[in-house]
Amino acid sequence: MSRRNTDAITIHSILDWIEDNLESPLSLEKVSERSGYSKWHLQRMFKKETGHSLGQYIRSRKMTEIAQKLKESNEPILYLAERYGFESQQTLTRTFKNYFDVPPHKYRMTNMQGESRFLHPLNHYNS
C-alpha cells in the first residue's frame, strides 16, 4: 500500500473518530495521541488530505453542530457548552460569536442563517 493511501486511511479514521467525539474536549494532543503520530506530522497530513487545518476543522464542526442544536432545540447554551467540551458558557459564546458574528442567544432567536459557514463531516463526502 502506498504512503498516500496509508495517510488517507489514517485521516479517514481520524475524521470518523472526531465525529464520534465532537461532544468532548478535542485537543490536538488528544487527536495526535489517538492517531499515533506527532502533532506536527498529523497536522501536516490532515491539511494535505483535507485542505483544512486540524484545529480549524474541529472548531468548525463543533460550531456547526451547536448552531444546528440552537435552531432545533431549546437546550440551554450552558448545557451546549458543557456538552461540546467548552470550559464555560462564556468561552462558547466568545468562540461562537467569532465564528458566526453573533452570540448564540441572538442566533437562536433570529432567522439568521449561518449555513454558509457550516462545515459538514468530510467523511460523508469522501467515502
Swiss-Prot record:
InterPro entries: Homeodomain-like_sf, HTH_AraC, HTH_AraC-typ_CS, MarA-like. The keyword Hydrolase does not apply. GO terms for cellular component: cytosol. Residues 12-110 form the HTH araC/xylS-type domain. GO terms for molecular function: bacterial-type RNA polymerase holo enzyme binding; DNA binding; DNA-binding transcription factor activity; sequence-specific DNA binding. One of its GO terms (biological process) is positive regulation of DNA-templated transcription. Induction: By various antibiotics or by sodium salicylate. Residues 29-50, 77-100 bind DNA. Keywords: Activator, Antibiotic resistance, DNA-binding, Repeat, Transcription, Transcription regulation. It holds the Pfam family HTH_18. PROSITE patterns: HTH_ARAC_FAMILY_1, HTH_ARAC_FAMILY_2. May be a transcriptional activator of genes involved in the multiple antibiotic resistance (Mar) phenotype. It can also activate genes such as sodA, zwf and micF. NCBIfam families: MarA_TF, PRK11511.1. Monomer. This is Multiple antibiotic resistance protein MarA. It comes from Escherichia coli (strain K12).
